[in-house]
Amino acid sequence: MADAGTITLTRVASVDGYIDLESIRAAMTPGTSLVALTQAANVLGTVQPIEEIAPMVRAAGALFLVDAAQSAGVWPIDLKSTPIDFLAFPGHKALYGPTGTGALYVGPRAKPRAWREGGTGGDSKTPTQPDQMPYFLEGGTPNVLGVAGLLAGIRWVSERGPEALRRHEVDLLAKVVDWVEKSDAWKVAGAWDADRHVGALSLVVPDDFPPQELALALDSSFDIAVRSGLHCAPYIHQRLGTFPDGTLRLSPGPFSTEQDIDVFLHALTEITAGVL
């Protein structure tokens, strides 16, 4: 839309992964219609204080959209006390549902347009989408099997507790951070604060080891799967100075163990020492 000249887009970024509130305030103008924010960065794992940002956006008269792709399931989001107008998240990440599932919360202030028209299984006498949510945005046959799988995932997360799941993953990452801090060759991309982090950590690799080659070596020789490259987020890598090669991202889950981390760190040591 910005390329077509329909809207004016302003990006607010931070090198350490934590957005400065004053930077957001300074970027807003009387004509600002929407502020969109990723709650937890998929590259760095850093978590933004949406509880502080949301009232500021509301006071400016703009709508507030939160991308909770990396936070839903591991970070509490209180829609009753936090003025959020849109909250979007997929089901296949920390909610452990099937791919192709997700949800969009639409607050009472937001008035979206129907993005498609079709049968809803009710109110068939109306030629357009029903006014009632969520049917207004859900034309066509719903993904019943996907929703059932997502519900099972949500129940699993609820039984264990989002904070317990997050803490387990962050504790494993803390072991990696400790190893990196003792290394002369490796660096953690962005800031590290275990209390404001989810289970993703990017490593800036030594100059002689492209991230893609490291990821391939980890996979082929140690059966370890990590993500290398730009992680669908080129702008943050430009800010980090890791563009165009990107970083090596580690994202342990609830089934990962300390032994898994030990194997990962041993593998990095062997690869960078030239053993392989």
Put a short name on every predicted segment.
Residues 1-276:
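Pyridoxal 5′-phosphate
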